[in-house]
UniProtKB/Swiss-Prot annotation:
Free-text function comment from the UniProt entry: Protamines substitute for histones in the chromatin of sperm during the haploid phase of spermatogenesis. They compact sperm DNA into a highly condensed, stable and inactive complex.
Chief subcellular location: nucleus
Similarity comment: family membership: Belongs to the protamine P1 family.
Presence of the UniProt keyword Nucleus in the record: yes
GO biological process: chromosome condensation; sperm DNA condensation
Family annotation (Pfam families): Protamine_P1
Organism: Nasalis larvatus
Identification of the protein by name: Sperm protamine P1
Keyword Zinc-finger appears in the UniProt entry: no
Tissue-specific expression: Testis.
InterPro entries referenced in this protein's UniProt entry, alphabetically: Protamine_P1 (IPR000221)
One of the record's GO cellular component terms: nucleosome
Amino acid sequence: MAKSRCCGSQSRSRCCRPRQRCRRRRRRSCRARRRAMRCCRRRYRLRCRRY
């Protein structure tokens, strides 16, 4: 289930890699996961908000 969340979540390389899945999986996950995601906090900081 961690893989189907926003941008991966626990995986470091998977967190800032599958941004296309983020857009199709769930939009609320990204917002809540944005805080849990450290690698996504910088690169997907604005993008996570859109997904």
